[in-house]
Amino acid sequence: MSDSSRIGVVLLLATAALTGVIYAIARPTPPERMKAYGGPIGVLGRWAYFVTRPLLRVAITLRLTANAVTAVGAAVALAAGGFAAVGEWGWAGILLVFGSWCDLIDGEIARATGTQGKAGAFLDSNLDRLSEIALFAGLAASLPDRSASIWAVAALASSLMVSYARARGEGLGVECPNFGMERPHRVVLLMFAMLFAPFVPGAGGALLLEGACAVVTVGASATALGRMIVIHQRLRRQEQGPGGSGPAGSA
């Protein structure tokens, strides 16, 4: 890993610390959709929205569409996967930060300009999955031993199952509740692991990333299983109908 990636990470963390102090002093009202997240993820999410407000205003002034920003974010995430594949984990983490900011801004642009729609949501969801595939594939390619690569592949598989369970449930008319290790949790965990990996001596950086992939595997697998159980139960209740004795409309 290059010294330039370490310098980049230090500058990024210093900027984050400075804006964090400003955020703590300003205490802005959090966006409505961020109120669903609590704990560290909620704090980081509200801070990220605060930091990206100037970028949001610039994007709207330049008349950038939400889909254009979504595409830029996906391209940045793909580049992060490429850097991860060659072992430049610090740069991969930095790019993942900027890609995540694009992921925040695109939805805000759509809401601010009244251009929300199913087509944009479909594009965003698919590019999110592509970004995750690129990131975990890059880690699988660069981690030094077979067990670490297996953890990266397992983390990818379990992450996709979390998304698929929700998508399939909603396709069958069942709303899936938010719980467990969702995409924001996975992204933040990998982001911090990649940002700090360049500073861990020896093989410690690879072990840190392997551990992060293992945590994602366990957490996402449990989340996917929980969603499957919840959605299956709700579908069964729908089939049984109000009386609970059989499919709705049966004699």
Model-predicted segments: where are they?
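Basic, amphipathic juxtamembrane/active-site segments
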Residues: 96, 107-150
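Alpha-helical membrane segments and adjacent membrane-interface helices in multi-pass membrane proteins
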Residues: 74, 83, 90-108
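Residue-level recognition of specific faces of alpha-helices
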Residues: 68, 94-97, 101, 118, ...
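Active-site His/Glu-centered metal-binding helix of metallohydrolases
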Residues: 101-109, 122, 126-130, 161, ...
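Hydrophobic alpha-helical transmembrane segments
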Residues: 1-90, 135-251
